[in-house]
A protein has these predicted regions:
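Interdomain signal-transducing alpha-helices
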Residues: 1-10, 199, 217-221
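Regulatory loop-to-helix N-cap segments in sensory/regulatory domains
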Residues: 1-3, 7, 203-204, 208, ...
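Amphipathic coiled-coil signal-coupling helices
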Residues: 6, 10-20
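… and, occasionally, acidic/histidine-rich disordered N-termini of signaling adaptors
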Residues: 17-195, 248-281
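Short, well-structured alpha-helical segments that form the helix of a local strand-helix-strand
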Residues: 108-119, 230-242
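Structural preference for long, well-ordered alpha-helical segments in enzyme cores
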Residues: 115, 194, 198, 217, ...
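Divalent-cation-assisted or electrostatically stabilized phosphate/pyrophosphate-binding catalytic cores
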Residues: 181, 189-190, 212-225
Length: 281
């Protein structure tokens, strides 16, 4: 544990760790985006939240956040429209509004409306951010989700993708008029995994135009579930599959977040792991 704390502390004060993780030089926008990320993984005896963002290096717009506070787990995934610094600023504002509401212990409906208003007031009607907000009660497995024009998360149960956690058609943050979004409510079973992703994952294309697609993502998730690998390793393998499918530099950021609930008694200790990226081949 002490060694881990020393590494985490050193990472805050030296740029060498960050440069090596990135693999190659980033644009200013992508660097800003990278520095916005939380620890890669949070883990307790009840739950694991793991995220991975593979940046397009010249593009920036994806961002994710997560926290564990007692019996409450919050997860968010955002994708700002466009490319470059403008896209990063959109996501930064959405993330800031989200974190403020979460720390004020607001419900998801209020949080959704606040993010929507913040984007609209600052950027007008010409900009938007898609996103998904998730809240899990680890004592009961009760889960709430709100969606803002984003790909619907997948639910993995008993090593099978059993469906999407979807609502009726929703609109992105910034164009909803503060009206919020319908809540999805469900109850997880011990061992369930919720998988959030951005369009950069499923829209990665081979030179012949073949998209990676949701079906391929679901198939790989089921294969990885059968392997019983740790969520962090599952993410690395999924992102590697996206990169291999693309066969070259990504055209858009590709981000995945896994939320796995194991059930069982609550634990006070939360173990963070610092951000990282898949090393280029």
């Amino acid at each position: 544990m002490l060694a881990g704390l020393l590494v985490a502390s050193a990472a805050r004060y030296t740029d060498l760790v960050h440069v090596r993780k990135r693999g190659r030089s980033m644009s200013l926008a992508a660097s800003m985006q990278w520095d916005l990320l939380p620890p890669l993984t949070l883990r307790t005896e009840q739950v694991v939240v793991a995220g991975m963002l593979e940046p397009a290096y010249e593009v920036a717009g994806d961002g994710f956040d997560h926290s564990i506070n007692g019996d409450r787990v919050d997860v968010a995934l955002f994708d700002g429209m466009g490319h470059g610094i403008g896209s990063t600023l959109l996501t930064t504002l959405a993330m800031g509004a989200y974190r403020h509401q979460r720390r004020e212990r607001r419900d998801l409906a209020s949080t959704h409306a606040t993010i929507d208003d913040a984007i609209a007031l600052q950027f007008g009607s010409d900009a938007f951010v898609t996103g998904v907000l998730v809240r899990l009660d680890t004592a009961s497995g009760a889960l709430e989700l709100t969606n803002a024009g984003h790909p619907s998360p997948l639910l993995l149960r008993d090593r099978r993708v059993v469906g999407e956690l979807s609502t009726e058609a929703t609109v992105p943050f910034g164009v909803g008029g503060g009206s919020g979004s319908p809540l999805v409510r469900t109850t997880l079973q011990p061992g369930d995994t919720v998988v959030l992703y951005t369009d950069g994952v499923v829209e990665a294309r081979r030179p012949d135009g073949d998209e990676f697609g949701v079906d391929r993502l679901a198939d790989l998730l089921e294969r990885e579930a059968s392997s019983e690998r740790a969520p962090e390793e599952v993410l690395r393998r999924l992102v590697r599959a996206v990169l291999d499918h693309q066969g070259g530099p990504l055209r858009d950021d590709a981000t995945l977040v896994l939320l796995r609930w194991t059930g069982g008694p609550a634990a006070d200790e939360v173990i963070p792991v610092q951000p990282g990226s898949v090393e280029p081949s």
